[in-house]
Amino acid sequence: MHEKHMTRAFELALQGYTQTGCPIGAVLVDNATGEVWGEGHNGLVQEGNPILHGEMAALRAAGRRTHRHDTTMYTTLQPCFMCTGAIVQFGIPRVVIGDTANASSDETIRFLRSRGIEVIVLDPTTSEAAANCIALAARFRRERPEQWLEDWGGGPNPRLRPVC
């Protein structure tokens, strides 16, 4: 089950990458039905929107659905603090992550868990989707390090550091 939805999140990340954007995709799924409520990818470059991360795009696409207490957010990369806050705010009880290798710390995972949110990190040795997420993010970081830092709030300010 996790592989299917993470594969879709990866496809969305790849879509963002081919549009010269940051390769992060996310899918919000209803646990009871398996229905995809919303999906999206990072849109910083494409839409000039610094808060349109993959998770935010998925939440936006899900619209005004009110019972998110039985959903799972699949994300190709460990969420940043902004997206972590949105996950907590909307009461999403489970987050499945494809890539933590390209994150600089586990702060957001620890925060989610401290709020009672189940966090599942897929193992890239057993999940092809997770391995793909890690490889794509690493490639992007090598090719466009400035854009990677900008997306995580690093920009030109040396006091800021990306969490993810």
Language-model region placement:
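Short, basic/aromatic recognition patches
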Residues: 1-21
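Conserved hydrophobic/aromatic pocket- or pore-lining residues that grip, position, or stack substrates
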Residues: 9, 25, 58
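Secretory/periplasmic and organellar redox-cofactor proteins
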Residues: 10, 14, 32, 131-164
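Flexible, active-site-adjacent loop/turn segments at secondary-structure boundaries
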Residues: 22, 35, 49
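Residue-level recognition of the N-termini of beta-strands and the immediately preceding loop/turn
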Residues: 22-24, 70-71
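Short beta-strand scaffold segments in enzyme catalytic cores
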Residues: 24-34
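Zn2+-dependent cytidine deaminase-like catalytic core
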Residues: 38-135
